[in-house]
Amino acid sequence: MIVVSKVLVDLKVLPESADVDYEELKEAIREKLESMDVVDIEGMEEEPIAFGLKAIRVKVVVPDAEGGTDALEDALKEVDEVNQVEVVSASRTL
């Protein structure tokens, strides 16, 4: 039996501007992640940055695979209104 370990990834998603509709952005992020069958969404919340700009903190569980979080980051960068995606942390789950 092959057991694939999983990784909890904490991402910070920065929008293009503070004028974005954050609820719509979170929904677009959720839809993109759900289209990736290997992702389990653990949580999503807004984090104030400065001058009205907020980051969306996204926590997901993905299989521990070669290439790390690259596919996840690339997929989120495809979402309209997303400017930057940063991996805050990644750790194996038990």
From Swiss-Prot:
| Highest taxon listed in the record's lineage | Archaea
Q: Which UniProt keywords apply?
A: Elongation factor, Protein biosynthesis
Instruction: Enumerate the SUPFAM superfamilies for this protein.
Output: eEF-1beta-like
Q: Does the keyword Metal-binding apply?
A: no
The answer to keyword Protein biosynthesis applying to this record is yes
Pfam families per the UniProt record, alphabetical: EF1_GNE (PF00736)
- A GO term for molecular function: translation elongation factor activity
* Family note: Belongs to the EF-1-beta/EF-1-delta family.
The job of this chain, per UniProt, is described as: Promotes the exchange of GDP for GTP in EF-1-alpha/GDP, thus allowing the regeneration of EF-1-alpha/GTP that could then be used to form the ternary complex EF-1-alpha/GTP/AAtRNA.
The record's listing under NCBIfam families reads: aEF-1_beta, PRK00435.1
- Protein name as catalogued: Elongation factor 1-beta
Q: Which organism is it from?
A: Methanopyrus kandleri (strain AV19 / DSM 6324 / JCM 9639 / NBRC 100938)
**Underlying gene:** ef1b
